[in-house]
Amino acid sequence: MEKDRARRPLFELDEVPQAAKIKVIGLGGGGGNAVSRMMAAQFTGVDFIVANTDMQALRASPAPVKIQLGAKLTQGLGAGSNPDVGRNAALEDPETITRLLEGADMVFITAGLGGGTGTGSAPVVASLAKDLGILTIAVVTKPFTFEGRRRMLQAEAGMDALRNVVDTLIAIPNQRLLSVVDRGTPLLEAFKVADTVLQQAVQGISDLILVPGLVNLDFADVRTIMSGMGMAMMGTGVGKGEHRALDAAQKAVASPLLDDTSIEGAKGILINFTGGADLSIHEVEEGARIVQEAAHEEANIIFGAVIDPSLGDEVRMTVIATGFSEKKTQTEPSGKVVDLPRAARQAPAAAPAGSTAPAWRRKYESRGDLDDPLAENDYDVPTFLRRSAD
């Protein structure tokens, strides 16, 4: 008896899941395409769901879980680009959606806004997820200008509805893809690039939780930065050479693809560096300082680092910035759409006195740390998109 008591542990640890449960639900045609691309890229560690009013699109999806929205309302024929139909279709059977979302710690909602199903159903699905206490993040695209004013207005209305029911909203304007793809890029390829951007946004966040790190980030860290934060900015960058971490940081905070937001003024920031075994603390500090100087002085910054030998001499940085003031996110002007080949041939104009360039850029320009290889028209474009444009 005494021996048995002596062998007993002084305390017992309750078993807990090793990782947060993450689900990705693609709504409508755009969201479904994004899920297909994520699966083709062998994006693992998450559960995929697609939901659509169009039965033909559902049958073609490789997703293991499929939801037909509005079977009675639309007869499987789609929403006819009418968001009201998309909304009512999602409301036809909310119990099924809720059942398939249950058990998740985090849900990503992906959709292309402007049409019927994605625009109308996304706020409904987000509201159901929030009712379950799930951290809910929407990653959506906005239409190209050539898709017409009505589609853009519907997208803006969808954005407004989503803002009220998600924890974090990341919006990617398709129009800005014109600044990072070649003029001869076929239309279908341009839409594929939009799907890739959605994939990068979702994977950039989920990897922070799912991939073990030298300095670990976990679901609690991500929840701290993204819960109830509204509009967000997410950027990724890859650097090589002597100032590779600095290079990666500059690319990550200067993405031209994210909707009317920059890192300046952010009050919540999550940073993740990934590099080979030779990644040094001084490199990480140099890159993180770029982000720190651009953010709000009282920003809550959470940092993680992952060793991935497959990267070789490259360093990859992911930054997620949240907590922007409403005034900033609503009034900051959109970036110009430029012809990339033409822009690449032109030297950037000198900044006028009292320039409003980001603090990190002014500082490093004054120190001479920004060499020609990091000129603005180059480092503003994420590496994976430059490769797509080549």
Kindly label every feature range from the protein language model.
Residues M1-D390:
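Tubulin/FtsZ superfamily GTPase core signature
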